[in-house]
């Protein structure tokens, strides 16, 4: 069965000149759900942070995601364009955010916040890592609603290919946004929910973060095989994509964090 991408308006609603886009709603919802979830996981033994500290970190996380995500996109994906159009860097409403940049932004925010508040950074990061896949799921759903980041032409065996008219052709494609939402969001979220329930893992500071980081890298590399590469980059050497290249270090870093946590188990 071949499906047609259902045309959505990217705007949820408008009041005069003020508009709320689905993409903004995804970010807001992800932050609120993540905040409540981290409040719960941070209180699990060993306690990573107080509820008030989690509340305070919400602002830091928001800045890390937005600034890191935007600058990551500028640096990793279109540095030459933004070098000649620097004022467009602030035009986040035009789209263009990088998870890898957002990840680095939040990492810096965690370290800075934890040093400032005398919190164990890896233990705090472990509890935050549990909530991140839900945000990834919502972000990919927003990508689908916006009709962006569509997939490569689908193989004959794929049961539900989709036609994206905005791609410029009527070729059936993989609904890659939904595939990535399933891998990076649902599957990884289930893995993290199971992992955080093991007290031994919670005492291995950095292990939960490592599971998330490595798990995301694997999910992203897998999902990229279904996704059409960005038109301004195309395929990189050996048929890879920028998303895959940036995810390889994440797998290595994740494995390193798991080993570190196992070796330096906290009391």
Would you name each region that the model predicts?
Residues 1-267:
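A feature for loop-to-transmembrane-helix boundaries and adjacent hydrophobic helices
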């Amino acid at each position: 069965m071949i499906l047609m991408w259902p045309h959505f308006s990217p705007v949820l609603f408008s009041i005069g000149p003020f508009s709320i886009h689905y993409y903004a709603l995804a970010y807001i919802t992800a932050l609120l759900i993540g905040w409540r979830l981290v409040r719960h996981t941070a209180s699990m033994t060993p306690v990573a942070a107080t509820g008030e500290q989690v509340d305070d970190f919400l602002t830091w996380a928001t800045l890390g995601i937005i600034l890191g995500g935007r600058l990551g996109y500028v640096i990793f994906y279109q540095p030459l364009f933004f070098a000649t159009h620097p004022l467009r860097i602030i035009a986040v409403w035009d789209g263009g955010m990088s998870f890898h940049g957002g990840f680095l932004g939040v990492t810096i925010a965690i370290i800075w916040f934890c040093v400032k508040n005398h919190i164990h950074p890896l233990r705090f990061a472990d509890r935050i890592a549990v909530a991140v896949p839900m945000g990834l799921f919502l972000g990919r759903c927003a990508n689908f609603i916006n009709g962006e980041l569509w997939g490569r032409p689908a193989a004959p065996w794929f049961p539900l290919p989709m036609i994206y008219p905005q791609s410029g052709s009527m070729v059936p494609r993989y609904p890659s946004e939904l595939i990535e939402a399933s891998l990076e969001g649902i599957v990884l979220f289930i893995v993290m929910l199971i992992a955080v329930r093991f007290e031994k893992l919670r005492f291995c500071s950095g292990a939960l973060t490592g599971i998330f980081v490595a798990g995301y890298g694997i999910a992203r590399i897998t999902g990229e095989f279904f996704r059409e590469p960005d038109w301004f980059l195309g395929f990189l050497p050996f048929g890879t994509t920028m998303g895959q290249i940036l995810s390889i270090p994440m797998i290595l870093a994740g494995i390193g964090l798991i080993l570190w946590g196992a070796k330096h188990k906290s009391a």
